A protein has these predicted regions:
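A generic structural signal for ordered secondary structure
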Residues: 17-26, 98, 139-143
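A short gly/proline-enriched turn/hairpin at secondary-structure junctions
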Residues: 35-39
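Conserved N-terminal beta-strand and adjoining loop/helix that marks the start
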Residues: 1-25
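Short, solvent-exposed aromatic-acidic interface loops
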Residues: 28-33
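Unchanged
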Residues: 40-133
């Protein structure tokens, strides 16, 4: 199906992780599903700028306390029919960055029912379309080992 005349939809987010044995990561509770803190880019934003803005808006966690892994960037591509675009089929690209916190931060969920910290379990299944793929990409990024921030922790 052609996407002629319709620019792709771009969104970005951050997989927030905390070192430990095992490390843990944050997911947001939408009431009916879990997801990463992410959202659509605003005009003129880079993927990273949008990811950090969405992370701050959805979690209340300041970008100042997050260390972004410069070697990890994962893109997910799929087709959507979003209401905001009149349900016309569009290509959507979601870019996910990996961010590390020194410790679990207080989360202020302003746009969601809540949040949950998950302990890292290799190849766990949470949500096939986005989360599982990102977690597998992170594990592959670390050579199949338990993720750890650069320089150890």
């Amino acid at each position: 199906m052609s996407n002629a005349g319709h620019p792709e939809i771009r969104a970005a987010g951050v997989l927030l992780m905390v070192p430990g044995s095992p490390p843990s990561f944050l997911l947001m509770d939408h009431g009916h599903r879990l997801d990463l803190p992410k959202g659509h880019l605003e005009e003129g934003e880079t993927d990273l700028e949008g990811a950090l803005r969405e992370m701050e808006e959805e979690t209340g966690i300041s970008r100042a306390v997050v260390s972004i892994d410069p070697t990890f960037r994962h893109e997910i591509r799929y087709r959507v029919r979003e209401i905001r675009y009149g349900r016309e089929p569009r290509n959507k690209v979601v870019v996910i960055f990996l961010g590390w916190l020194a410790e679990r931060a207080q989360v202020v969920a302003t746009e969601h029912a809540g949040h949950r910290w998950y302990s890292w379990i290799s190849r766990q299944k949470i949500q096939a379309q986005t989360i599982d793929e990102v977690l597998n990409a992170v594990e592959n990024h670390f050579g199949g080992k338990v993720p750890a921030p650069a320089g150890g922790a």
